[in-house]
C-alpha cells in the first residue's frame, strides 16, 4: 500500500513538474491533464502549422530574434540543395548524350573524323610557306667550276667564249670538268627469275639480289660534235664560218676563214670589263692570179655569146621583104632562147619607147641616104601642094572630100607614083613603111570624126 502511494505521489509530482515546465514554455494551459497532449506527440507534430496548434489548444509560438535568423539560413540551404540537384542532373544528361553519340554508326563517325583531320591539315598547310621555285639551270650553275665562271667574264669578245675553232666550246669544257665530291652508290634491286623444272610442274623462283652501281660522270671526248653556232670569232680579227654542203647524200661542214665583223674587243682588267675598238690587222689577202683567171673566164664567156648571136643573125632570113605591089614590109623575128648569162651581161639603160621604129643602119642599107629617118608623124601637107598635085574636082563629092581632109586618111592613103616623079618612090616607100609599122598607135585618133582644114592644131600625135 505504501509502495502504491509512493508511485502515485511520484507520478503526480513528475507530472506537476512537467506541467510546470511546459506551461512556462507554451503559456497558460488547463489544469486537466487528460486534455493536454503528450510531449512526444507535440514535438512530432508540425509546429509550423498554425491550424494544428489552434485545434489542440496550444497558443501560437512567439518568435524571437534567433528564429528569425534561422529562416533565411534554411532558405539558402534549400537553394544550395536545389542547385546541387541541377548540377547533378546536367552531368547525368551529358553522360546520356555521349552514350547516344557512341551508339551512332562507326562509318559516319569515321567520315566526320576524316573531314575534321583534313580541315586541320589544310589550316596547317596555309600557315606554312611553300619553298621558293628554283630553275634547274640555276641549280646547275651552282655546281660550275671556277674556270667556267671565269670564262663568262674573260672571253666576252666572242660568242662562245673561245679564241678559235681549234679550241673547244666553253660549254663542253666547263661541263666536262665538273667535279662531284659526294659520290653516292645506287642500290638497284634486280629480280631474277629462274625456272626450275621438277618432273611435270614448273616453279618460278624469284630471287632479289642487290647490285651496287657507282654514280660517276662520263666525260665526253673533246670536240665530239661541232659548235652550236655558224661562226666563230677571235680577238686577232679573223673569224671562221661554218659552210655546209652536200656530198653524195651526206652533210659536209667546212670551216672557212672570213673577215671579222666585230667592232669592239672585250678584256678583263683589274676585275673590270674593258671594251676597246677592235684593231683588225689580218685582212684577207686574195690572190691576184685567181682574180685574173676569173676575169679571163668571164671575157671568154662573153665572146662565145657574141659569136652565137652573130651566127643566129646570119642564119635568119632578111628582115625586109618586098611584096608585088612595091611596098616594104618587115618580117617578124623568130624568138631566140634567152639564157641566164645574156640576162646577166645585158646592159642596163633606159629602153626605147618606140620599139617598132627601124634603126638608122637598116634604113641606110634598104633606102636612099638622102631620105631622113622619120620618128614621128609625117608633116601635114599644105593645101596649095595638094591642089597642084590632084586634079580639079569634077563632082560635088570631090569638093566635099577635099574640104574635109584628114591627116589619118592621108597617112593611110596608097601612094600615087604617077603624079610624082620617079625620084620620090623611095621616099613614099619609107613613109608607107613607117605608116604600116606605127598604124596601131594611130587607131584611136583615126576613129574620130573628120575635121576641116581650118583647124591648126595637129590631132594625131605619137607618144
Curated annotation (Swiss-Prot):
Keyword vocabulary terms for this entry: Chloroplast, Plastid, Transit peptide
Comp. bias intervals (Basic and acidic residues): 117-126
User: What residue range does the UniProt record give for the transit peptide?
Assistant: 1-44
Q: Mind telling me which InterPro entries this protein's record contains?
A: FAF, FAF_dom
Tell me which positions the record assigns to the signal sequence: none
Question: What family is this protein classified in?
Answer: Belongs to the fantastic four family.
Protein name per UniProt: Protein FAF-like, chloroplastic
Q: Which organism is it from?
A: Arabidopsis thaliana
Amino acid at each position: 500500500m505504501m509502495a502504491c502511494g509512493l508511485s502515485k505521489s511520484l507520478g503526480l509530482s513528475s507530472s506537476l513538474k512537467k506541467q510546470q515546465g511546459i506551461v512556462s514554455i507554451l503559456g497558460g494551459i488547463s489544469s486537466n491533464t487528460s486534455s493536454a497532449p503528450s510531449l512526444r506527440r507535440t514535438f512530432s507534430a508540425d509546429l509550423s502549422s498554425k491550424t494544428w496548434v489552434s485545434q489542440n489548444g496550444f497558443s501560437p509560438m512567439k518568435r524571437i530574434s534567433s528564429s528569425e535568423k534561422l529562416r533565411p539560413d534554411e532558405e539558402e540551404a534549400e537553394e544550395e540543395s536545389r542547385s546541387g540537384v541541377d548540377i547533378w542532373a546536367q552531368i547525368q544528361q551529358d553522360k546520356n548524350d555521349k552514350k547516344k553519340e557512341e551508339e551512332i554508326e562507326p562509318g559516319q563517325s569515321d567520315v566526320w573524323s576524316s573531314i575534321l583531320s583534313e580541315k586541320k591539315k589544310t589550316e596547317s598547310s596555309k600557315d606554312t610557306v611553300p619553298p621558293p621555285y628554283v630553275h634547274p639551270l640555276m641549280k646547275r650553275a651552282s655546281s660550275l667550276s671556277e674556270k667556267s665562271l671565269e670564262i663568262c667574264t674573260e672571253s666576252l669578245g666572242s660568242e662562245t667564249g673561245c679564241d678559235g675553232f681549234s679550241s673547244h666550246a666553253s660549254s663542253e669544257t666547263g661541263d666536262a670538268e665538273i667535279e662531284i665530291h659526294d659520290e653516292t652508290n645506287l642500290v638497284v634491286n634486280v629480280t631474277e627469275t629462274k625456272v626450275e623444272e621438277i618432273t611435270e610442274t614448273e616453279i618460278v623462283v624469284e630471287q632479289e639480289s642487290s647490285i651496287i652501281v657507282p654514280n660517276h660522270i662520263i666525260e665526253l671526248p673533246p670536240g665530239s660534235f661541232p659548235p652550236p653556232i655558224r661562226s666563230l670569232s677571235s680577238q686577232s680579227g679573223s673569224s671562221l664560218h661554218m659552210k655546209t654542203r652536200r656530198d653524195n647524200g651526206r652533210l659536209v661542214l667546212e670551216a672557212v676563214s672570213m673577215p671579222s665583223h666585230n667592232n669592239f674587243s672585250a678584256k678583263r682588267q683589274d676585275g673590270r670589263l674593258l671594251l676597246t675598238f677592235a684593231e683588225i690587222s689580218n685582212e684577207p689577202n686574195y690572190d691576184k692570179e685567181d682574180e685574173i683567171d676569173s676575169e679571163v673566164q668571164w671575157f671568154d664567156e662573153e665572146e662565145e655569146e657574141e659569136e652565137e648571136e652573130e651566127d643566129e643573125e646570119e642564119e635568119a632570113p632578111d628582115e625586109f621583104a618586098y611584096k608585088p605591089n612595091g611596098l616594104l614590109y618587115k618580117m617578124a623575128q623568130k624568138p631566140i632562147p634567152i639564157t641566164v648569162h645574156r640576162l646577166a651581161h645585158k646592159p642596163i639603160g633606159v629602153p626605147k619607147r618606140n620599139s617598132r621604129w627601124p634603126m638608122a643602119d637598116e634604113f641606110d642599107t634598104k633606102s636612099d641616104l638622102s631620105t631622113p629617118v622619120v620618128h614621128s608623124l609625117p608633116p601635114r601637107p599644105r593645101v596649095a601642094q595638094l591642089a597642084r598635085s590632084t586634079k580639079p574636082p569634077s563632082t560635088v563629092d570631090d569638093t566635099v572630100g577635099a574640104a574635109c581632109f584628114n591627116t589619118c586618111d592621108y597617112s593611110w592613103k596608097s601612094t600615087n607614083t604617077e603624079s610624082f616623079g620617079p625620084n620620090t618612090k623611095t621616099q613614099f616607100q619609107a613613109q608607107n613603111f613607117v605608116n604600116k609599122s606605127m598604124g596601131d598607135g594611130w587607131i584611136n585618133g583615126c576613129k574620130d570624126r573628120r575635121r576641116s582644114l581650118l583647124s591648126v592644131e595637129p590631132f594625131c600625135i605619137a607618144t
